[in-house]
């Protein structure tokens, strides 16, 4: 049973927001009020449907005492009762605390791990996989920085993904992705294992955290392409070092001004993510065990090309649809991860 007083509080809050917006809230308030109103609207719709179902059931049960209506009530009651548990579960999910970062754009960072050039090639495959997934979702995918490897892979890539639910869906991708396949350069046909690391960060705005100028060092250098050759003759590439944490961010586009913007954007996202992780760890000692914890050292997934198999180790999900997955069809695995995370948070909330 979902506590009715909690539901009524939400309805009253929604009605208050509706009245404030209709009355013409102050310009400084409108954005925050509108955001909260939009978040509560689907929850209030669930509450309304649930209350209607309870009222219908109560009316049908009251009809049992009427000899003329008893038969009709006995026919209706089983179906009405059967609806209630599903509606209560939907309400519990709707009442889960929202991650404030879910509505933000995502900063996606991909780097090869163990495995040399094959790891760099796989990192490139992952970048294309996420780009296709983003395009399929109707999101905007912007490549912020790309350092290619000699054979067409990547040494490092940073992208920005913007669209409804971008970070909420992509945040489960943080971690170590392992690949098992026969490299194109392997003459003996032996299967090699290599890995790439993915980090997904919520984009941070300047108002989220202040970075004092004294805390950063900005260096300019020449941009390098595959094999380390210089791709231009001006010192346009930018490296920013955050002195308190030691975080280093680089950007090597052609415009030095744009490189500063990109590097600061990524640095803000990393620092914001550090603070989010610190707060999450303080709230729950079990956070590291949860799906979506963002632990970049965790091996989360294996892509086995000879078997056409992808296994997500966090939820023991195996799908034999690797070509489709690498082509950007991530909906099934991300939906499964979302459901698992919701179930874990529900259990924690109700414990």
Swiss-Prot record:
The keyword Cytoplasm applies. Its main location: cytoplasm. GO terms for cellular component: cytoplasm. Transmembrane segments: none annotated. It comes from the Bacteria. Methylated by PrmC. Methylation increases the termination efficiency of RF1. InterPro entries: PCRF (IPR005139), Pep_chain_release_fac_I (IPR000352), Pep_chain_release_fac_I_sf (IPR045853), Prokaryotic/Mito_RF (IPR050057), RF-1 (IPR004373). It is found in: Cytoplasm. PROSITE patterns: RF_PROK_I. SMART domains: PCRF. GO terms for molecular function: translation release factor activity, codon specific. The modification N5-methylglutamine is found at residue 229. It holds the Pfam family PCRF. Keywords: Cytoplasm, Methylation, Protein biosynthesis. The keyword Protein biosynthesis applies. Peptide chain release factor 1 directs the termination of translation in response to the peptide chain termination codons UAG and UAA. Belongs to the prokaryotic/mitochondrial release factor family. NCBIfam families: prfA, PRK00591.1. This is Peptide chain release factor 1. It comes from Cereibacter sphaeroides (strain ATCC 17029 / ATH 2.4.9).
């Amino acid at each position: 049973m979902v506590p009715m007083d909690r539901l009524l509080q939400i309805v009253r809050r929604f009605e208050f927001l509706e009245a404030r917006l209709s009355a013409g809230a102050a310009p400084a308030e409108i954005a925050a009020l509108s955001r909260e109103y939009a978040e509560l609207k689907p929850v209030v719709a669930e509450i309304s449907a649930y209350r209607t179902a309870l009222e219908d059931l109560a009316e049908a049960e009251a009809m049992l005492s009427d000899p003329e209506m008893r038969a009709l009530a006995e026919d209706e009651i089983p179906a009405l009762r059967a609806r209630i548990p599903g509606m209560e579960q939907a309400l519990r999910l709707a009442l889960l605390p929202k991650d404030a970062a879910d509505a933000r754009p995502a900063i996606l960072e991909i780097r090869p791990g163990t495995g040399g050039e094959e790891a760099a090639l796989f990192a490139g495959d992952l970048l294309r996989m996420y780009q296709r997934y983003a395009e399929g979702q109707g999101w905007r995918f912007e490549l912020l920085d790309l350092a290619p490897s000699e054979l067409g892979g990547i040494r490092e890539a940073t992208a920005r993904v913007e669209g409804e639910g971008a970070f909420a869906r992509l945040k489960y991708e943080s971690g170590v992705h392992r690949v098992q396949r026969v490299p194109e350069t392997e003459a003996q046909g032996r299967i090699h294992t290599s890995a790439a690391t993915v980090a997904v960060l919520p984009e941070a705005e300047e108002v989220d955290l202040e970075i004092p100028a004294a805390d950063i060092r900005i260096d300019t250098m020449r941009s390098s392409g595959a094999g380390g050759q210089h791709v231009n003759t001006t010192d346009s590439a930018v490296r920013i070092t955050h002195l308190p944490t030691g975080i280093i961010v680089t950007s090597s586009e052609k415009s030095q001004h744009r490189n500063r913007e990109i590097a600061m954007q990524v640095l803000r996202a990393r620092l914001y993510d550090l603070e989010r992780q610190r707060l999450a760890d303080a709230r729950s000692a079990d956070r590291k065990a949860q799906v979506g914890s963002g632990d970049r050292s965790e091996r989360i997934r294996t892509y086995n090309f000879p078997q056409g198999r992808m296994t997500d180790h966090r939820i023991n999900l195996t799908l034999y649809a690797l070509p489709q997955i690498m082509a950007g069809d991530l909906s099934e695995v991300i939906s499964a991860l979302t459901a698992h995370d919701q179930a874990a948070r529900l259990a924690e909330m109700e414990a």
